[in-house]
Amino acid sequence: MNTNQIILTNQNDNSVNVWSNVTQDLYNYYGEALYNSWFSKVNFIESSLNTVILCAPTNFIRDWIKSKYSVVILQLFQHYNNAIKTVEIITKELPASNQATLELPTKTFADIGSSELNSENIFSTFDIRFTFDNFVVGAPNELAYAVARAVAESSSAVSESNPLFLYGGVGLGKTHLMHAIGWYIKQNNPSRKVIYMSAEKFMYQFVKALRNKEVMSFKEKFRSVDVLMIDDIQFICGKDSTQEEFFHTFNTLIDNNRQMVISCDRSPSDLDDIEDRIKSRLGWGLVADVHSTTYELRLGILESKIEQMNVKVPKDVIDFLASKIVSNVRELEGALNKVIAHSNFTAKEITLENTQNILRDLLRSNERIITVEDIQKKVANRYNIKLSDMSSPRRMRTIARPRQIAMYLSKILTPKSLVDIGKKFGKKDHTTVMHAIKKVEELLESDLELREEINLMMKILQN
């Protein structure tokens, strides 16, 4: 069977259309490889009253889909028909005469024209995996989460945080929050027009509109929405024509009390090769950063993911992943998925030794061993204090604060215990280290300048 096709039984048009939409969503959410491995081999049998019946080609595929994807599939069916309460998956042969072939839609969001902005197709551009309910909140992201939720739940056309500007490193949750905003609005306010798009796609569509002499349609498409979300705005740096169009789109939407949500890998003030008037406007509303994960947040993310997947992972494996995969959430979840998939396909138990072997190449490629000594040197240099001050008993604020920051970074960036960290700082006990970490975490909640300072030092140390 063509991997871009789905086999359907002869059903009424509505059933066929719903199944077509569900398969397109599954394809978008999980990607071509996973879709072709599991969902492309599933047949739609019938829907009656509140039950949908699907057919898998083997017991193994049936059981795998039931255990891993049944909740997602049911949610997708319920989006298109909320009367559906159950999805059953069976295995049996279908007579060829009862089968009809439907090409899997290949249209991407970038291909949607202005005439389709009112359609529910836009709903399917939001990833069902990225909701507020499954976003793990911790000190590094709680402000961004709170304001994103406030924007989504705002009863007025526009929130007080307009525009909302989210910034932080790759894979830390900015895109998750943007999808969560989109999902929430479309579920609770389906009449509102919402566009989510990367800045790169915005530019490509603008160039295409110029080439095809469809600039007015382009303007109408983006300036008539209720909520416009642009991801990775740094992409338009140095692209003068795109900046000009974005500037006027921004002004039109803000003037008309329409909500804007922007994400970036840095704060507005740190953007280079972008017009000052755009920089200024990006900071008009609320600027919230999503900074690097803490060990505790990584633990929470792993535990949440494991619960969603309904699998058992030993605590020492979870601790190992949280300690070693520190770069971003995306890589952390990818490592967990790889370990679980290896166990499922090889029937081998998930153990620390197996995990280390499975992730050997990943760990080696990301191996930037950061030591407490590295951190002490970097922080001492940053704050113009002597390296010896890191282990001295001196309590002057100009020395104590950098020392606390170094302890905080040591906890985040190294696998060292509080006791071991304390030994590196003049044989301080673990309660002193704990107090320092807590103090810095409290400061990070309110001190934007300190947050940016620590984020910068973390990037330097990790790179």
From Swiss-Prot:
Q: Where is this region: Domain IV, binds dsDNA?
A: 344-463
Domain I, interacts with DnaA modulators: annotated span: 1-84
Localization of this protein: Cytoplasm
InterPro entries, alphabetized: AAA+_ATPase, Chromosome_initiator_DnaA, Chromosome_initiator_DnaA-like, Chromosome_initiator_DnaA_CS, DnaA_C, DnaA_dom, DnaA_N_dom, DnaA_N_sf
Entry binding sites for ATP: 171, 173-175
Q: Which GO terms describe its biological process?
A: DNA replication initiation; regulation of DNA replication
* Entry's Gene Ontology cellular component terms: cytoplasm; plasma membrane
Q: Which GO terms describe its molecular function?
A: ATP binding; ATP hydrolysis activity; DNA replication origin binding; lipid binding
- Which PROSITE patterns does this chain map to? DNAA
Q: Name one Pfam family in it.
A: Bac_DnaA_C
Query: Which region ranges are annotated with the description Domain III, AAA+ region?
Result: 125-343
Q: Which UniProt keywords apply?
A: ATP-binding, Cytoplasm, DNA replication, DNA-binding, Lipid-binding, Nucleotide-binding
Q: Where is this region: Domain II?
A: 84-124
Question: Looking at the record's lineage, which domain of life comes first?
Answer: Bacteria
Give the quaternary structure.
Oligomerizes as a right-handed, spiral filament on DNA at oriC.
Q: What is known of its domains?
A: Domain I is involved in oligomerization and binding regulators, domain II is flexibile and of varying length in different bacteria, domain III forms the AAA+ region, while domain IV binds dsDNA.
Similarity remark: Belongs to the DnaA family.
Q: What does this protein do?
A: Plays an essential role in the initiation and regulation of chromosomal replication. ATP-DnaA binds to the origin of replication (oriC) to initiate formation of the DNA replication initiation complex once per cell cycle. Binds the DnaA box (a 9 base pair repeat at the origin) and separates the double-stranded (ds)DNA. Forms a right-handed helical filament on oriC DNA; dsDNA binds to the exterior of the filament while single-stranded (ss)DNA is stabiized in the filament's interior.
Protein name, UniProt field: Chromosomal replication initiator protein DnaA
